[in-house]
Amino acid sequence: MAPPRNVVKIAVQMRDAIPQLIQLDQAKPLAAVLKEVCDAWSLPHSERYALQFADGHRRYITENNRMEIKNGSILCLSTAPDREAERLLRGLQSESREGRREALRHLLLLAPDLTFAREVISRDGLQRLGTIIEDGDDLGEVLALALRAFLELMEHGVVSWETLSIPFVRKVVCYVNMNLMDASVQPLALGLLENVTLSSPTLGQLVKSEVPLDRLLVHLQVMNQQLQTKAMALLTALLQGATPAERKHMLDYLWQRNLRQFIYKNIIHSAAPLGDEMAHHLYVLQALMLGLLEPRMRTPLDPYSQEQREQLQALRQAAFEPEGESVGAGLSADRRRSLCAREFRKLGFSNSNPAQDLERVPPGLLALDNMLYFSRQAPSAYSRFVLENSSREDKHECPFARSSIQLTVLLCDLLHVGEPCSETAQDFSPMFFGQDQSFHELFCVSIQLLNKTWKEMRATQEDFDKVMQVVREQLARTLALKPSSLELFRTKVNALTYGEVLRLRQTERLHQEGTLAPPILELREKLKPELMGLIRQQRLLRLCEGTLFHKISSRRRQDKLWFCCLSPNHKVLQYGDVEEGVGPPTPESLPEQLPVADIRALLTGKDCPHVREKGSGKQNKDVCELAFSVSYDHGEEEAYLNFIAPSKREMG
């Protein structure tokens, strides 16, 4: 006769004892189960003991998670979490260095378990770890273990980072600023300061004032990937917490110290593969760099500004008055105004008063900046563009100013200028670190591409929007290739001619039409059962191979990874935390299990609980597109296993 549904057959182990094979009644209180297990081994005081999962992080069994125990689970009897917390915290005060080290190692092993973490925190465990960190008696392994345990306990969110004391933060800053320091300590100290900076504006200002940018540059230039990554993480956190003016000042200083060149040569083009966390921080740095353009993009031209009027005149003169010659010399004021208005029209402005064209935001003054940069950095190309088009028939001239204004809007859109940083994105473009003034340089390439495409399309003024659509496609396709330099971008985008764009469009259209043709649809319907079987096999195979996922908190992107896969018999989802840089784990080594039979539903996008918790906003859009959750039975409640897919391709 089969056992009742709420009874599971499990094994319970204890050191130096013969394991027990028992039938666990999930309806029975856990205290009663513990007493029965202890009685079988003649152990008094069952309240001093607890059950743990025998593998992985050895999580404690509680009334909240006991439904995760399944048939065949192996548990072990161990000291209750409150008593274990007390024992280890006493060990931290040992006069023996080895005793403190062993206590810290064991504490670190159990710290990921929330039940144990709460017991430690309630007994002032964070303060005791803080004392070890502040005293700094041992700058080697003991300090590294204390920092790691402190970070693990704080990760549970039971205590806010804002509660940390100023002396404690200053001491951690000292470890970052010290020259001779154990290699395992500084990445942990940097990681702790990153958390502080992102979570507390007040303490973030303290970190900003006491960690010199030069010190972070030193850490970035050490050939140690972990140290580089944590230094970059703190740098981007400091930049994100700064005001726009402070951010500009900081980035200007970093660029003067050749950080851009170092990133390009020694991080992006390093022989070692770029880690996901570093890729994310480079994306954030790129977004912050481009974000400096936002004030100009949001500011319309002021017709009463003498400086801006002079800039417009400089733009006109560079095209029509070479080498400082004044064409309007000797003319009356009215004739001179009429001549200037005509030349501004030839320059491609829609209005005789160009200030009216630049009142639109975006792109505001950023479009004027781009045009001036092009006229000064590529004067020959600029004058050739303007003079060629101003001498063509009216219908076929490519309006430089109108094109520049629209192209600036297009580039800002493609590069997400002014949008909040994503929490998950890693899609930085290497060429932005390979070039000074990268946005303006990209504009110079793009405006010449636009002129070339205009000619290839034999466009007229009525075709302006069509030309812009083609240029958008040319730029988007080339940017998606992530060229490593501006020169490579120039080569690739110029090779993508209007004819090539048409060919690609036609190929894609024919592919779509072909797949929807009646004979194809009929054949597909006939083969559907076989195809569905193959698709099912392929998907099961992919699920069995497993995938690495990033852990995402409501505050920031985490550097922790976890792995999930389907068991070979397709009955259980197996998952657990893994270290970055380590190969995919074997299913047997993963500590957590979720029976497929317990799964209720698959949720995606806004229906996922971890997306609902994060709220709305632009920064949440990409998370929403990549989010999915598995809901499952957890006792009488519904629980969730939450995922953020690595990419849209994986999500598909």
Swiss-Prot record:
Domain ELMO: 307-479
Gene3D superfamilies the record matches: 6.10.250.810, Leucine-rich Repeat Variant (1.25.10.10), Pleckstrin-homology domain (PH domain)/Phosphotyrosine-binding domain (PTB) (2.30.29.30)
Cell compartments where the protein resides: Cytoplasm
Keyword DNA repair tagged: no
Primary localisation category: cytoplasm
GO cellular component annotations of the record: cytoplasm
UniProt keywords, alphabetically: Apoptosis, Cytoplasm, Phagocytosis, SH3-binding
BP terms from Gene Ontology: actin filament organization; apoptotic process; cell motility; phagocytosis
GO molecular function: SH3 domain binding
Assembly information from the UniProt record: Probably interacts directly with the SH3-domain of DOCK1 via its SH3-binding site. Part of a complex with DOCK1 and RAC1. Interacts with ADGRB3.
PANTHER family the UniProt entry points to: ENGULFMENT AND CELL MOTILITY, ENGULFMENT AND CELL MOTILITY PROTEIN 3
Function: Involved in cytoskeletal rearrangements required for phagocytosis of apoptotic cells and cell motility. Acts in association with DOCK1 and CRK. Was initially proposed to be required in complex with DOCK1 to activate Rac Rho small GTPases. May enhance the guanine nucleotide exchange factor (GEF) activity of DOCK1.
Protein name: Engulfment and cell motility protein 3
Organism encoding this protein: Bos taurus
Gene name of the record: ELMO3
